[in-house]
Amino acid sequence: MRAAGPWRAASPAPCTRYLARCKPGFRPSSSFVVDLLVDSGDPGLEDVALTECLSPPSLSCSNSTLSLLSPLGHQSFPFGADDSEGEDEEALDEDARESESKVESLEGIEFQQRSSCEVESQDKQEKLVLLQHGSLTPWEMWFVGKEKEERGRLQQKFLEELNQQIEKRKEMEEREKRKIIAEVKHKEWVQKKNKQERKEREQKINKEMEEKEAKKREKEHLQEKAKEKYQEWLKKKKAEEYEKKKKEKEKEKQRQAELQEKKEIAEKKFKEWLENAKNKPRPAAKSYGYSSGKLTGFYSGNSYPEPTFYNPIPWKPIHMPPPKEAKSGPGKKSKRHAASQPLPSSSLAVHNAKSSLCLGALCRGQR
């Protein structure tokens, strides 16, 4: 059994085509009923069409649905010799209607809102027609009711599937919309981020340039300050050098004056001594020498004069008490022992002094 689309618009051409065949005494065949069911797009219209075909000719042929009687077109219902009429035509119409139903099923919700009022009024008309013309048998009425229930179930199932498809389509559209919004926001964020990074880089470069300029200015300031300090130090150093040289010159001048004064005093003293030396008596001859193998005395200005006094008591060394035995190590004992050795005798020292005097006198004589 093939069911037509639930929200299919009622086309007046097929309805008039089939209703034109509804004449007095016409018995609809199964194929005729199926075609009429397929062409009709609404259950209310099917009932009206069925009643119009089964009613006397005086009734008007309005748009109705015969889809509820589609099982009557089965082979088990022998309606007469008109079953083979228009089968080829029905096959072609079925293919066209199937392709149209696929396209028109997507527009069901919009058509539902527009045709809801019309369907209700047509249902009322169908009920009135069926009540006025009870041309169906009880079994047919029961079968029509069952088919109506089945059609309602199929319509509900189709509506649910259609709603699911619409929901899926809405979800896909919403997902695409969110995706587009996310892409736009991401692009805006990337642009904002790039702009911010570019701004930060520019600020960083400007800051580095400002720091370089500040360091350069500070360096130049320090160089100028150091130059000024150096000039001040150099000026001060030159002043100190000038003062130092001036003091050295004054000292040198003073030293030269002192030397000149000393020289003059020395020359004066020498002249005085020279004048006094002419009148000074000479000392007695106290030098001795050998002449022809004999010791004789003579005067020599290079010899030392004879001492006028000498100590008749010979020199004696100072008495040193013997050292006490120390309790310390042997190194300290040896030191004390070395320190306690007696000094050389005074006679030897006197002899050495005399010999040195004699040697000095001889050296002067040789000169």
From Swiss-Prot:
Residues 82-97 have a biased composition (Acidic residues). Residues 87-108, 153-280 form a coiled coil. Residues 339-349 have a biased composition (Low complexity). Signal peptide: none annotated. The modification Phosphoserine is found at S55. The keyword Zinc does not apply. Its main location: other. Keywords: Cell projection, Cilium, Coiled coil, Flagellum, Phosphoprotein. Residues 77-105, 191-228, 310-349 are annotated as: Disordered. Residues 197-228 have a biased composition (Basic and acidic residues). The keyword Iron-sulfur does not apply. GO terms for biological process: spermatogenesis. It comes from the Eukaryota. InterPro entries: CCDC34, CCDC34/181. Expressed in testis and sperm. GO terms for cellular component: sperm midpiece. Involved in spermatogenesis. Has a probable role in anterograde intraflagellar transport which is essential for the formation of sperm flagella. This is Coiled-coil domain-containing protein 34. It comes from Mus musculus (Mouse).
